[in-house]
């Protein structure tokens, strides 16, 4: 019984987070003009990693807004935790520090443990922000695949749509939530070489496909008008 309650708390987030969400959601939605597509794809429970393209420093806030049933936690570069206002904000969002100067084994272990405990973790496979750039032309890092396979977690692909892949206040932001990818569908083979790179490529391909599918639907809608 206690385990079930803890898992639910991990999914929903702390009481403080839920209060902050209730207070700020309307403000965030107004400033960023967020529209969520595929909200029905958000799972009610289960361990999973959210993987998205990365356009702006506001992306974690936008994704947290889109996922109503879960608190999406993030790894953030440790330098951000020394900036007073930013540090407070990202801590509310459930972020924890990572040293991007090398392989931060401790941060990876913490991320894996968090997912195993039922927390929802958000990762940007690109590793950096790429505004005004087609995400398919960017490089990716293997952190999402590494954490997902070690935690045996499902993947939730997400694509953030902004005009010209550029963030501006009061410009519409679409968050497209794709269908859950079960861990078994990743076909992870711990004995095979290059598995993390392969899985990362497959995950990010599905992420980008969400954006392309959304663009195609928008184009068809305009033609019919």
What are these regions (language model features)?
Residues 20, 83, 107-108, 141:
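Generic non-transmembrane alpha-helix signal with a bias for helix starts/N-cap capping motifs
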Residues 2-12, 108-225:
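Non-catalytic C-terminal accessory region of glycerolipid acyltransferases
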Residues 27-29, 67, 90, 114, ...:
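A generic structural signal for well-ordered alpha-helical segments
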Residues 24, 92-98, 127-131:
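Short, basic, glycine/proline-bearing loop/turn elements
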Residues 2-38, 44, 84-93:
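A transmembrane-helix-recognition feature enriched in membrane-embedded lipid enzymes
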Residues 42-102, 110:
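Catalytic core of membrane glycerolipid acyltransferases/transacylases, capturing the structured
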Residues 15, 19, 103, 195, ...:
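Soluble or luminal CAZymes and related metallo-dependent hydrolases
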Residues 29-37, 102-105, 158-159:
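Short gly/ser/thr-rich secondary-structure transition/capping motifs
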